[in-house]
């Protein structure tokens, strides 16, 4: 990735960075919650974004 990015690319990367985090613990603690983990986590080496 180049150091000179367009704003569109930068915004896209920022969104992906925010999405790539575990679910909050309080969501797991909710009664009847079936969500155990964030199934859409992405590892920087294994799966690329396709830019």
UniProtKB/Swiss-Prot annotation:
Entry annotated with the keyword Transcription regulation: no
Classification via Pfam families: Ribosomal_L39
Keyword entries, A-Z: Cytoplasm, Ribonucleoprotein, Ribosomal protein
Cellular component terms (Gene Ontology): cytosolic large ribosomal subunit
Taxonomy, superkingdom: Eukaryota
Protein's UniProt keywords contain Cytoplasm: yes
GO process annotations (BP): spermatogenesis; translation
InterPro entries xrefs: Ribosomal_eL39, Ribosomal_eL39_CS, Ribosomal_eL39_dom_sf
One Gene Ontology MF term: structural constituent of ribosome
Tissue spec. comment: Testis specific.
Subcellular location: Cytoplasm
PROSITE patterns associated with the record: RIBOSOMAL_L39E
Role: Male germ cell-specific component of the ribosome, which is required for the formation of sperm and male fertility. Replaces the RPL39 paralog in the ribosome of male germ cells. The ribosome is a large ribonucleoprotein complex responsible for the synthesis of proteins in the cell. The male germ cell-specific ribosome displays a ribosomal polypeptide exit tunnel of distinct size and charge states compared with the classical ribosome. It is responsible for regulating the biosynthesis and folding of a subset of male germ-cell-specific proteins that are essential for the formation of sperm.
HAMAP family listed in its UniProt record: Ribosomal_eL39 (MF_00629)
Complexes and interactors: Component of a male germ cell-specific 60S large ribosomal subunit (LSU), which contains RPL10L and RPL39L, instead of RPL10 and RPL39 paralogs. The composition of the rest of the complex is similar to classical ribosomes.
Family designation: Belongs to the eukaryotic ribosomal protein eL39 family.
Descriptive protein name: Ribosomal protein eL39-like 2
Lineage per the UniProt record: Eukaryota, Metazoa, Chordata, Craniata, Vertebrata
GN (gene name): RPL39L
């Amino acid at each position: 990735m180049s150091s000179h990015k367009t704003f569109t690319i930068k915004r896209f990367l920022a969104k992906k960075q925010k999405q790539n985090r575990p679910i909050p613990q309080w969501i797991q603690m909710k009664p009847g919650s079936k969500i155990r983990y964030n199934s859409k986590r992405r590892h920087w080496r294994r799966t690329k974004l396709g830019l």
